[in-house]
Amino acid sequence: MDDSKNIIIKGARVNNLKNVDVEIPRGKLVVVTGLSGSGKSSLAFDTLYAEGQRRYVESLSSYARQFLGQMNKPECDFIKGIPPAIAIEQKVNNRNPRSTVGTTTEIYEYLKLLYARIGKTYSPISGTLVKKDTPEDLLTCMNSHPEGEKFMLLAPIPKRKGRKLQEQLEIYLQQGFTRVVLGKEIVRIEDYTPQKGETPALLIDRLSVSRSNETASRLLDSAETAFYEGNGECLLQFLSEEQPYRFSIRFEADGIEFEEPTEQMFSFNSPIGACPDCEGFGRIVGIDEDLVIPNKSLSIYDGAVFCWRGDKMGEWKTEFCRRAPQDNFPIFEPYYNLTQEQKDYLWHKGPWIEEYGEGICIDRFFDMVKANQYKIQYRVMLARYRGKPICPTCHGTRLKKEATYVKVGGTSITELVEMPVSRLKVFFDNLVLDEHDAAIAKRILTEIRSRVDCLLDVGLGYLTLNRLSNTLSGGESQRINLVTSLGSALVGSLYILDEPSIGLHSRDTDRLIKVLYRLRDLGNTVVVVEHDEEIIRAADYIIDVGPKAGSYGGNIVYRGNMSDLAPGSNSYTVKYLLGEETIDVPAYRRTSNNYITIKGARENNLKGIDVKFPLNLLTVVSGVSGSGKSTLVRNILYRSLMRHFGNSCDTPGQCDSVDGALKQLCGVELVDQNPIGKSSRSNPVTYLKVYDDIRHLFAQQPLAKQLGFGAGHFSFNSDGGRCDECKGEGTITVSMQFMADLKLECEACHGKRFKNEVLEVKYHGKNIYDILEMTVGDAINFFQEYGQKRIAENLQPLQDVGLAYIKLGQSSSTLSGGENQRVKLAYYLSRQSDRPTMFIFDEPTTGLHFHDIKKLLKSFERLIARGHSLVIIEHNMDVIKCADYLIDLGPEGGEAGGQLVVAGTPEEVVACEASYTGKFLREKL
């Protein structure tokens, strides 16, 4: 490689990196791979990105730097040739409740411009186009009539405050006007006596239709006068016609003056465009429909309205059901089948009761509850049904109603943002504009189309532009940031991405690779931390960090292209890519006669499907992104089972029933990627309850007994042994008022979390801080060496799930989503429980190398051997091929998904031509 075109790192020692030297070619797609914990992120993010960011900040003025703070130099000898660095991580950093997919990708900014520039306003009353008239419009109207036809140009006489009509007519006489018109009758002003109810118009000019320039010029001049005298309005009365043609220079139609489109009119972040009731949030604090009617499959007669239950409140239901049929309301119809008009009747109108002077409806019921909220039971009831429902004024669109009157291609901006991106592409591809509008919108449409295409390329065609950013998964958020980066068209930069393939089906990986190539071809260096085989094979250059994890990793075990791979390497990545190591297909598939059956699943995009989940098997739910996997498994299966076992949870997704062999299960556990603890002091050993044994071990040491230390002195969650200054955190948080809080190492304990006298207690030369700083692998060896088998055995599950590299005392806040999930799996493996439980995993292979996946599958086998059932949402083909039973949803994402494509063994799925999963699985079997 040419040194002048490379990024050169010498002696990198960040975290577990062992003084590594590495060259990264500029302007290439470089994949950094290796086992979990081998040092990939330490190299890519903590060294490369940290230095690129630091140098960029150093290049700014001292004034700008004061707002950015001091950035530490990564621990290495030197780094040369590094461009400005941009990190695109999996974290969902945007917690702003106003941020959406549209605003993040900037598509919405261009839509606002488009609607402000070429949007056409239509009257909601008649549907006619609202526009300002000009004198040229009068000329066009005249030319549409036959030559020689006579007509009059009139100005309506506006009412002047404090001035009578007679006085106004006298002023007209003084100005040189002589006649008014009543109907078609012309009357001299001095001869006219105003009568009540009459509306005369001022005669400006009388002409005959002619195509001559002289007539056109005269009409245009007279039209200017007519508009001025008529306060922006004028009339053309053809003598052969009864009704005059009305023209106005005001933006009005049907007697309503409309607001002219501007960018701010379509901004929900501006008071000019935001809905006045919800202030642009789309939701208000009020009575929540989902809480009032939790089961939408029930009819009103069967008790769909949850607050109309019990002896006293039930009277409302009884009275409603007795009277509503008179208004043709279907009281026996399931709530989800009611029309919007029928729902409005139930909520806002109801059957009218003469003696009360109001209707029986849900709104009236809660008015009664609010009127009685001085009583505790009514306050409790109000709190129970209060949530953040969709704003009834804007129906969740966030904009005021005037914005919805403006349309492009017959569609309002609120309709566009509710379309999936896949439909948005069709809309803009088929958008037909006239020559004038096309010229104005050319650049805007180019930007919109390129960003929409990019969203499709990264597999996000199922998202809508109004989807909130804080509801996206880490993988979705990262790919949206990738789209934003492409849109900004930066060149000569260093992009560092963290597993962009997360949450992506194999079908979409090829398109993601093309997006990465586009970013590279702009002139950027793209460094991707990745485990996906297709992306590794597509790389221009591969850097493998290893050979193992933690203290056994941190070396560069391979660098080069795919063509340079050679057998006999100590790199696990090379071994798997060359087929020297493989994840084997199971010799046989287990079967089961017991199922949990979901019937009529129709939450979100699910199309009323019936699905069976076999017990005591490894069941994988697959399908392209947005096909409905999480909705089926998390929203319906998990929540329904939680309710069945008497646990509180969110309302289960809509379905007809969840039944089957429920008695065969004793519980359900969702092993997700949320942090393992709410406190920054929580860590893997406290979560697995191993720390109790370690604390008791230290309390038994002679010095501890001599000083009177109990197990509590070795806890950083209680006073006694922990540092009094930092309360066992190891850091002090300094509030920076308007800036992010600053964390500084505690000066009292120097980050060791305990008092000096506690740290003097040692077990075979190690104090409690030294033990917490050990990796899981080192700790297992240490405790086995000194006969502490119980502690070593309890730590073993962490090693079994591929977490040998994490430190025992590592704060849960520093663990990735995938690591959190595997710590939870280790906890369940350590419990040795034989109560049959259904475990639900959502993409457990996140952040895992081929070799780690092999270990993970062995952990799954151990759970099944104990009589448990596993349901896994997964895209990874190595896990899918090992499933006993496969449920494939699709065929596409979003509206085109939500159907059961095929269910059965992997071999049966491969035989299904309609299954995308089957096509890619065929290569693995």
Predicted regions and their residues:
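Conserved phosphate-binding elements of NTP-dependent enzyme cores
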Residues: M1-L925
